[in-house]
Amino acid sequence: MSVLTVPSLPRPHTPLHRPLMYFAAANAALVVVGLIGMLVDDRVIAGSTAWFKPTKFAISFVFYSVALAWLMSLRPTLSRLTSAMATVVVVAGVIEQVIIFGQVIRGTRSHYNVTTTLDATLWVIMGSTIVILFLATLVIGIGLMRARLGDASITWSIRLGIAITLVGLALGNLMPQRESGVEGIAGAHTVGAPDGTPGMPLTGWSTTNGDLRIPHFFGMHALQALPLLAALLVVLAPRIPLLRSVRVRLGLIITASAGYAAVLALVTWQALRGQPLIHPDQATLTAAAAIVTGVVVGVLISVASAAGTRKVVTA
């Protein structure tokens, strides 16, 4: 019989990265600006309210920056390289947001826009900052992957979350490569129709065609989802004895990560076939059922791994 201890969340070893937190705060303010813009500005750009895209980007950057700053704080020491790369992320993000909000003020779209020399130049700059942001995140991710940031379940949730996030960021490259069918627009996120098709509430994702923004969004936020799940399992452990076993929690995290990656592959495949998220065909439903089955089996195996762990010791 092995001994179980009631787990606790890992504590930060270094201060939160200030530039990342300042950037998160600035984007939180931009969310307010965007919401006000949606209320008072009735302009439409690329089929949706003008302030919808910048508001979404601001919200995304808030979560992304806070999560990255928190994960970095869990390292016993923060290397100069990691800190510098985090600052690079901030600089790239600032440039991106300045262009996105600036283009809205001008009354034109930011992404894929090559209508004028200025628009084309801004789009090239945006494309460059996206690559820089990806590479900086990759360097930070490699450093975090090599470190032990808590128990095995927390550590692996971070490692796998970073890996899936990098895939999600990379999937963004699918959009500029697509033919838009519209003069002056170099790229598209809609598959099977020009951008601007009817969209879902809140997200704006196409309800009539495939939408490559879905896998991009879903993938890049694994950085928040999986570590949050691991933290939730730790928080619930005092009330649910089964979760006091690190083996069980690790198994659940691996299962969740595999399921997350599988869903990412599924929504990418679905989008590339020109199929809207809310109207799956039989092939998509069959694949989804297989993923659900695999996750259920993984959960059962993880729970079964707790056999023989009975005694509980409070840490």
Model-predicted segments: where are they?
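Hydrophobic cores of alpha-helical transmembrane segments in multi-pass integral membrane proteins
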Residues: P19-L39, W51-S73, T87-I105, I125-I140, ...
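Membrane-interface capping segments at transmembrane-helix boundaries
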Residues: G298-A315
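Short, Lys/Arg-rich, polar N-terminal cytosolic tail immediately upstream
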Residues: M1-L16
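Internal, conserved structured core segments that host functional sites
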Residues: Y112-L149
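Membrane-interfacial catalytic/cofactor-binding modules of polytopic membrane enzymes
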Residues: P176-L223
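Membrane-interfacial loop-to-helix junctions in multi-pass inner-membrane proteins
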Residues: P15-H17, S79-V90, D151-I158
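Non-cytosolic membrane-interface motifs at loop->transmembrane helix junctions
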Residues: I45-P54, Y112-I125, A152-W156, P276-A287
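Aromatic-rich transmembrane-lumenal/periplasmic boundary elements in polytopic membrane proteins
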Residues: S153-T190
